[in-house]
Amino acid sequence: MALDPADDPLLADCKYKLNHFRIKELKDVLHQLGLPKQGRKQELVDKIIAVLSDQQEQDSRLNGLPNKKMVGKETVAKIVDDTFAKMNGSTNAVPASRNQTDSGHIVKPKRKSDDSAQLDVKVRCPCGYSMANDSMIKCEGPQCNTQQHVGCVIISEKPADSVPPELPPHFYCDMCRITRADPFWVTVNHPVLPVSITPCKVASDGSYAVQYFEKTFPLSRANWEMLQKDEYDLQVWCILFNDSVPFRMQWPLHSDIQINGIPIRVVNRQPTQQLGVNGRDDGPVLTAYVREGSNKIVLSRSDSRTFCLGVRIAKRRSVEQVLSLVPKEQDGENFDNALARVRRCVGGGTEADNADSDSDIEVVADSVSVNLRCPMTGSRIKIAGRFKPCVHMGCFDLEAFVELNQRSRKWQCPICLKNYSLDNIIIDPYFNRITALVQSCGDDVSEIDVKPDGSWRVKGGAELKGLAQWHLPDGTLCMPTDTRSKPNIRIVKQEIKEEPLSEETGGRLKLGIRRNNNGQWEINKRLDSNNGQNGYIEDENCVVSASNTDDENSKNGIYNPEPGQFDQLTSNIYDLDSSPMDAHFPPAPTEQDVIVLSDSDDDNVMVLSPGDVNFSSAHDNGNAFPPNPPEASGICGEQPRGAGPDVTSFLDGFDDLELPFWESSSSQDAAGTQVTDNQCEMQNFIVNHQFLHEPILGVNLGGTAASNTLECEHDGALQACQSSDQDGDQNQTCHDGHSGDLTNLSIISTQDSLTNGKNASQKRTNCEDGTAGLDGSVVRSANGLRGEMPPLGQEQDRTVRQKLILTIESDSD
């Protein structure tokens, strides 16, 4: 026989609560019971009551609950009771009629399992009133659903103003604040719930009157036995509501505490001194002063501010336990976010910044030096920790930081000095990878260089095992890349066509050097070549020309193949990589071969025609130039022992190079060519001497009409190799022993070149290093002056210095 609902107090209590439920709460109960949630409100109530009345079989049509899914009445009653408590905001917030039904039956409230305060309430305010009103604020704690009255917990700095206080961007309740203030204590129980301490009143003399706060709390046997363990303590704490540092303890001015009549020291600072931003107060431990049963605490203070006081049973944590609360490296922050922060800090702005922005920050250095030492201990960082809200990239040693805060309780960033809590600490994924790699180095290695792109290297010597090289942000070795294009100078084989000289046009030679699409210099090839010319000697990248010298000149001592002389000659050979200095000459006809030196891609070239240049020893204005002495301009190959200084010894490598010499004009081609019996007397060089080891930076070959309009006031590219006496009566040339083998090239220089050349035109006849430099010439040769010829077969082997050389000398057959 079913029990009448009037005789079942549990059913009557649940029915009373169900009548106050909304549809939302009814559906929540049905959802937990696994029952259908469709229907009107009364239908939902009937489904729940049917489960409580033990009539599931008769009412299966109504509730649709199978027998195998039946639940007990105690379970249903607990679900209904919990839902009712959440709806009203507190488990104790039940109206007075809750304990008495409409029929007059008394319902005994359910006793709590212990004396601890219930923390899983929705409304809990220090004022003691647990009903919600129109102005509520919710705690941001992840496991806290507490709501509090705004007027009780948000205190205005100027209470006299009628303007309501501004809500903070982040709000934490008093319990969450005290938990984060010192993570080395974990709250177990609250014998005294947080209670508000009102400000003191102002006395007649303007001072604040001393006020007292008394609170009696029970201590159960279970809690008393818990406090007998070493890791548990009873602590009294106090916080300021509108504290600028939310996660810390702070006591009022002139605070004194008595526990069961025993006075206890509260703070170590002066009673009249307020706590600064960097200061921290501690909570006195009451374990030695309490007893099982009732205990009384009395607080006296004299302060105009509003505080909150409470008593808790807390358990101590070790350093390892606190470190375990810090998220792992992969859980704290994404590596890309850490890299973006480093790039922003090192680069001086975001990636969106450009040259048109108004930012005053400019990157001056290629890299920034970063110290890997902890700012608190001075030792090298082992685990790079940081506070997540910080915008800087500075880090600290995580283990050392946590260990130091066990006493100081100052969870403050040592770089920017902003206050946070343990919940904000993460492991920096960027710097933690670097510190892990640096652990194998000595203690003196503590700095790295960081580029704006995030790549890094350790500053130190070669003992760093590769860490001194640049690494990518993820720690991998960075491959060396050089974006700057280096000139790739190569010797390009060229075939030059020799055309027969005539009185009308003369013979022209074209050597085209231009820059290709890849930015490299190259020599244009010609298909119609004649390889039966004088030869070059090529040793890898070294190419020089051999001057025409016969046996007779060798006997007379004109040719000097001494080893010291050859070493000096090979060191003074220069290449042909030059650019034009004077581009005001008209382009020459393109039907014949000319010499071209240009860094332009245009096809218009400047030419120098033998017929257009005055080959006479005397110029139009009477100036004369000495010819180039017939001696070896450079030796870059090894000459066999016992070989005489014959010209054929310099022509062995000609077929490989395929670069013919300049063909000299005959005496019939240029009427101005004169021959004398003077033996290569070198005097009055009209040159501007440069150091023989300097490269030639500007070369231009230009030609004019046959009338030779190049005067002294024009800027010529080549210096002449002929000279005359000061009065212009006697001309001098260099005779090489062959009646018809002459090479004379007269090129007019500028007036400045003439002046400078005459100042430096003292006779240079030093036999040890007889050299002559031609400033701005196409062919810069190192010529040894005439000296004594050593006997044949006594020539020593010479070491060849490899250089990028392209030297062209003219000689005759």
Curated annotation (Swiss-Prot):
Its EC number is 2.3.2.-. Zn(2+) binds at residues 390, 392, 413, 416. Residues 88-114, 617-650, 753-775 are annotated as: Disordered. Transmembrane segments: none annotated. One of its GO terms (cellular component) is nucleus. Residues 88-103, 753-764 have a biased composition (Polar residues). Keywords: Metal-binding, Nucleus, Transferase, Ubl conjugation pathway, Zinc, Zinc-finger. Disulfide bonds: none annotated. One of its GO terms (molecular function) is zinc ion binding. A zinc finger (SP-RING-type) spans 357-440. It is found in: Nucleus. A zinc finger (PHD-type) spans 122-179. Residues 18-52 form the SAP domain. It comes from the Eukaryota. Pathway: Protein modification; protein sumoylation. The keyword Zinc applies. It is an enzyme of class 2 (transferase). InterPro entries: SAP_dom, SAP_dom_sf, SIZ1/2_SP-RING, Zinc_finger_PHD-type_CS, Znf_FYVE_PHD, Znf_MIZ, Znf_PHD, Znf_RING/FYVE/PHD. It holds the Pfam family zf-MIZ. GO terms for biological process: protein sumoylation. Probable SUMO E3 ligase that may regulate Pi starvation responses. Belongs to the PIAS family. This is E3 SUMO-protein ligase SIZ2. The lineage of its organism: Eukaryota, Viridiplantae, Streptophyta, Embryophyta, Tracheophyta. The gene is SIZ2.
